[in-house]
Amino acid sequence: MLLFWMWWALLAVFRAFPGIDIYFSQLFFVGADCDATAAAGNICGGFPYRDVAAFDLLRTVFFRLPYVVAIVMVWKLVECYQQHGATFNAERAQKLKVALGTLLIGPVLLVNVVLKEHWGRPRPIQTDIFGGALHFAEAGSLAGKCVSNCSFVSGEAASAGWLFCLLLFVPKSLRYAVAAPLAAISILTPAMRLSFGAHYLSDVVLGWLSSLVVFAALLALTESQQHQKNSEI
């Protein structure tokens, strides 16, 4: 519940102070002289990090990584259910279902199907204060004119948040070795989306946190059901 209310509290802060989003995007925006065809008052320029080949390659790798991990998890879940009786690992199956359920409900459905397709917030690069054609819309606003695959919230940040959740399921013997690179990927992914002008700070923060909210809710639900079953035995 704490994560749930934290998400809404952060949304309220970003809505009340939209200058936070504008400020952090301005850190990565480089202005340029407009050409003769530009209308008077237009702002010209761009986000140079999006044109760096190394960053673009990293973004591609980080974008695909959660879904590669998910495919491996599906395979492991199928393996679990090929076992029966004493050889069936119920705990592993439960963890895999929570992890895959979080990815499906959070980044896939909530973020990419519901929020990004219906909230209409233009990305920074689409916004007139950063050289685009659309007006700025604050976090959570329905007034934006983006038509599809919009800025609120970041799907890649949500997937990165999901990867971070998996640390809880990593065996203790591997946790220290895996924690640092996984945490780095989880933080770098939303940071790059911000630096590319693809999302505002609120989009990446709320997208990342949304996966933790869904993960915590599913984990609490499964643990409650397991506790209820144990009490009935």
Swiss-Prot record:
Keywords: Antibiotic resistance, Cell inner membrane, Cell membrane, Hydrolase, Lipid A biosynthesis, Lipid biosynthesis, Lipid metabolism, Lipopolysaccharide biosynthesis, Membrane, Transmembrane, Transmembrane helix. Pathway: Bacterial outer membrane biogenesis; LPS lipid A biosynthesis. One of its GO terms (biological process) is lipid A biosynthetic process. GO terms for cellular component: plasma membrane. It is a multi-pass membrane protein. It is found in: Cell inner membrane. It is an enzyme of class 3 (hydrolase). Removes the 4'-phosphate moiety from lipid IV(A) (a tetraacylated precursor of lipid A). In R.leguminosarum strain 3841 lipid A lacks phosphate groups, and both tetra- and pentaacylated species exist; the same is probably true of this strain. This is Lipid A 4'-phosphatase. It comes from Rhizobium leguminosarum. The gene is lpxF.
